[in-house]
């Protein structure tokens, strides 16, 4: 429940724009946010391994 309230709070327009921060829309995680994909690293990894994100492949060397 606390995570839902934090997600709602992050969506609101703040008085000072510099205080705005990104949150993962899938799980609500505030840290490790990837701007290019608009999700956190954990959700990105899970979806990439399932093949739901086009153009992303697991690297090996």
Swiss-Prot record:
Q: What's an example GO BP annotation here?
A: translation
Q: How is the cofactor bound?
A: Binds 1 zinc ion per subunit.
Record SUPFAM superfamilies: Glucocorticoid receptor-like (DNA-binding domain)
Pfam families noted in UniProt:
Ribosomal_S14 (PF00253)
The protein's UniProt keywords, in alphabetical order, are: Metal-binding, Ribonucleoprotein, Ribosomal protein, RNA-binding, rRNA-binding, Zinc
Write out the residues that bind Zn(2+): 24, 27, 40, 43
UniProt-recorded Gene Ontology molecular function terms: rRNA binding; structural constituent of ribosome; zinc ion binding
Q: Does the keyword Lipid biosynthesis apply?
A: no
Which GO cellular component terms, listed alphabetically, does the Swiss-Prot or TrEMBL entry include?
cytoplasm; small ribosomal subunit
- Which InterPro entries is this protein grouped with? Ribosomal_uS14, Ribosomal_uS14_bact, Ribosomal_uS14_CS, Ribosomal_uS14_sf
Please give the cofactor(s) recorded in the UniProt entry for this protein: Zn(2+)
Q: Oligomeric state and partners?
A: Part of the 30S ribosomal subunit. Contacts proteins S3 and S10.
Role: Binds 16S rRNA, required for the assembly of 30S particles and may also be responsible for determining the conformation of the 16S rRNA at the A site.
Q: Which family is annotated?
A: Belongs to the universal ribosomal protein uS14 family. Zinc-binding uS14 subfamily.
NCBIfam families linked to this entry = PRK08061.1 (NF005974)
Indicate what this protein is called per its UniProt record. Small ribosomal subunit protein uS14
């Amino acid at each position: 429940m606390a995570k839902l309230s934090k997600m709602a709070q992050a969506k609101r327009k703040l008085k000072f724009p510099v205080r705005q921060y990104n949150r993962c829309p899938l799980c609500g995680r505030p840290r490790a946010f990837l701007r290019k994909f608009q999700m956190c690293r954990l959700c990105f990894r899970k979806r990439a391994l399932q093949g739901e994100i086009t153009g992303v492949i697991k690297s090996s060397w």
